[in-house]
């Protein structure tokens, strides 16, 4: 979120769809958040979302606040209800940050936690960003650009972001990089180092013109696009990528179905 300039959070009057404690908490947000320093408008709505009662919020925050000040606003919003007997998954808030957006889909991030995530977003120019309650902690999802479409350069740039460790209170950072060229969580040191080394494979094999990479549950799934059918080159990539990890590879010509798939 280059230059995260403003924050918008959404809230409106609560109609009592959820349990009584949730409804009271939603009303407290609607009543108290407009008075928080740095908030220019706030509405919360108690409504059914995905078949479940949720308190959804929108808050507009003063333009020109620093990252720390914006983090304080986010934390102060959840301070209103943090100690109430309500579930973190029953509340969601959308923040408009000038040129970017932050959604707290669930969870009650503190000022410090919100600030740390926005600092990472600033540094990576990530937009949008989502914070959610996950596995008893928080998880942040960041969509960030890659400055290069050259395979070796984009992979190295992506790996640099995947090395970013989650702030305190977050179990994981999930990244969607370069319009989903790379989709992966935070990597450990060994996995990141292996991918860095793999980047040097691409300049030696120019028939591979682009790739996508998905990493989930420790499995790397690579989709290669080649300028011509080069099965031996693809097999060589699979062997190089497979060192120390589980890998799936497929290769295709532009706009065509795969001509080779490696389990």
Q: How should each PLM-predicted stretch be described?
A:
Residues 37-59, 129-139, 174, 207-222:
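Short edge beta-strands and adjacent turn/loop segments
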Residues 29-32, 69-81, 121, 154-165, ...:
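Short amphipathic alpha-helices in soluble, non-transmembrane regions
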Residues 15-19:
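Bacterial signal peptide processing site
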Residues 186-263:
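Extracytoplasmic/luminal low-complexity segments enriched in Pro/Gly and acidic/polar residues
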Residues 25-101:
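N-terminal Sec/ER secretory leader and immediately downstream segment
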Residues 54-56, 71, 82-175:
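Long, acidic/polar, low-complexity amphipathic helices and coiled-coil-like
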Residues 9-13:
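C-terminal motif of bacterial Sec signal peptides marking the signal peptidase cleavage site
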Residues 1-7:
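N-terminal export and membrane-targeting signals
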